[in-house]
Amino acid sequence: MSHADLEKTIEAAWEERAGISTATTGAVREAVDEALNLLDSGQARVAEKAGDSWQVNQWLKKAVLLSFRLNDMVPIEGGPGSSAWWDKVPSKFDNWGEAEFRAAGFRAVPGCFVRRGSYIAPGAVLMPSFINLGAHVGEGTMVDTWVTIGSCAQVGKNCHISGGAGIAGVLEPLQANPVIIEDNCFVGARAEVAEGVIIGEGSVLSMGVYIGASTRIIDRTTGETFYGRVPPYSVVVSGTTPGKPLPDGTPGPGLYCAVIVKRVDAGTRAKTGINELLRT
């Protein structure tokens, strides 16, 4: 079935989703299964770059949501002490052996959990982490320990997502865009990117930076303010904006913001260590 036919079938099923259940068979189930297989293999993505902007394939998000109506809960092996989990989404590695791992070409360290319907490109390294369905992790990217990459989040190639960082997912509301980390980015430990924010190519987020859709992102060199996106090759740290005076005239509390302390070109980014960029 072509992508256009899949989209048509899934869009029609979405409009009639109240009548879809684990008993549903036929074209709808086949279309949803095929859509998830496309996501799992990397042949389709929830978001794709078109020129300088990102296009979201909402029909693929709908396929993911429909799969929860279609699929029943089942035991999933691999729990502690030979126990099992109880869920609707199996592991990406279910029934994999050496041949499948070698063909996939990425490294999966014990303790990582990757749900079926997510794509991991060759050369990626997965430390003990969680990657949700619909997510896309690019070639050569390091996903460090205790990282969460949420549903439909898009992480580019040659990125480093440091320990405990969160790349938030999005399934609902349906119109919400996924978080996108473009190629060659560094996300510091315990940082969090959420609510459809786009981190531009080559950017560096310091440890503990939190960015959501309403977070003020201030370029301290130009004074520009951004919301929802970090420009390419930005070096970003946590900061505060001055508070407004309280009614009695005393200083009010400052508000959190993210600060672009500098911007670097691709050549400088490639030659300069992360710590040096953050400290100069």
Curated annotation (Swiss-Prot):
Transmembrane segments: none annotated. It catalyses: (S)-2,3,4,5-tetrahydrodipicolinate + succinyl-CoA + H2O = (S)-2-succinylamino-6-oxoheptanedioate + CoA. Its EC number is 2.3.1.117. It comes from the Bacteria. It is an enzyme of class 2 (transferase). InterPro entries: DapD_Trfase_Hexpep_rpt_fam, Hexapep, THP_succinylTrfase_dom1, THP_succinylTrfase_N_sf, Trimer_LpxA-like_sf. It is found in: Cytoplasm. Pfam families: Hexapep_2, THDPS_N_2. SUPFAM superfamilies: Trimeric LpxA-like enzymes. One of its GO terms (molecular function) is 2,3,4,5-tetrahydropyridine-2,6-dicarboxylate N-succinyltransferase activity. Keywords: Acyltransferase, Amino-acid biosynthesis, Cytoplasm, Diaminopimelate biosynthesis, Lysine biosynthesis, Repeat, Transferase. PANTHER family: 2,3,4,5-TETRAHYDROPYRIDINE-2,6-DICARBOXYLATE N-SUCCINYLTRANSFERASE, MOLYBDENUM COFACTOR GUANYLYLTRANSFERASE. Belongs to the transferase hexapeptide repeat family. This is 2,3,4,5-tetrahydropyridine-2,6-dicarboxylate N-succinyltransferase. It comes from Methylorubrum extorquens (strain PA1) (Methylobacterium extorquens).
